[in-house]
């Protein structure tokens, strides 16, 4: 099974001005595509060559895991954002955030603090844990909640420097502030609904 680069669901300039076309082009067509090419090379003629991307993430380690997880994480990141998104949450995710964090503003502040305070490269996640409670998680490098079995991902934000250095240089806080204008609450609602049914 050849791992392919998932198609973006919006144009490269669709997230501008919050994330520029230049950033999205490099991030998607260079970084994300690079992980795909590298993984296919690594799994050739191995048992992983017949497995799905998600199974590779769950079962692998080392370089194979790093590249597989980065493919999965990036796809989830693209879907966590969208044009004409952002603003206040709605539907089930709004109610669940209020239930587990007290208010959207509390959640937004806590999540932003995690994203800005994370040392080095990684990811910030909103996930549903085994107690059906929304939690904020942070993972280093290619880590994700699926591999760590710490929760079912609902949303993610990429805090590797390549996600923001073209647009914001070393100012991660400004990138995080801009990211809130792109959050795809419809995607979050879909993920929450599926997660609550498991």
Swiss-Prot record:
Protein keywords: Cytoplasm, Iron, Metal-binding, Oxidoreductase
Ligand binding (Fe cation): 27, 74, 158, 162
Cofactor binding annotation: Binds 1 Fe cation per subunit.
Subcellular location(s) per record: Cytoplasm
Keyword Metal-binding (UniProt): yes
Recorded catalytic activity of this chain's protein: 2 superoxide + 2 H(+) = H2O2 + O2
GO CC terms: cytoplasm
GO molecular function, one term: metal ion binding
Cofactor(s) required for function per UniProt: Fe cation
Keyword Lipoprotein applies: no
Any Pfam family matching the protein: Sod_Fe_N
EC number assigned by the record: 1.15.1.1
Top EC category: oxidoreductase
Family: Belongs to the iron/manganese superoxide dismutase family.
Oligomeric and partner information: Homodimer.
Role according to the record: Destroys superoxide anion radicals which are normally produced within the cells and which are toxic to biological systems.
Protein name, per record: Superoxide dismutase [Fe]
Organism per entry: Plasmodium malariae
């Amino acid at each position: 099974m050849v791992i392919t680069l998932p198609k973006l669901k919006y144009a490269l300039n669709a997230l501008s001005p919050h994330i520029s076309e230049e950033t999205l082009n490099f991030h998607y067509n260079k970084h994300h595509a690079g992980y795909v090419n590298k993984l296919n090379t690594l799994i050739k003629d191995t048992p992983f060559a017949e497995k799905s991307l998600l199974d590779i993430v769950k079962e692998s380690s080392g370089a194979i895991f790093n590249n597989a997880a980065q493919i999965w994480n990036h796809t989830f990141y693209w879907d966590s954002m969208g044009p004409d998104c952002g603003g206040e949450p709605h539907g089930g995710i709004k109610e669940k955030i209020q239930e587990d964090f007290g208010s959207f503003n509390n959640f937004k502040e806590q999540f932003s603090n995690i994203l800005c305070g994370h040392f080095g490269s990684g990811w910030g996640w909103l996930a549903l844990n085994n107690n059906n409670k929304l939690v904020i998680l942070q993972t280093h490098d290619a880590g994700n909640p699926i591999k760590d079995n710490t929760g079912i991902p609902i949303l993610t934000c990429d805090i590797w420097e390549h996600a923001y250095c073209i647009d914001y240089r070393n100012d991660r806080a400004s990138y995080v502030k801009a990211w809130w204008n792109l959050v795809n609450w419809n995607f979050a609602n879909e993920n929450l609904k599926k997660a609550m049914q498991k």
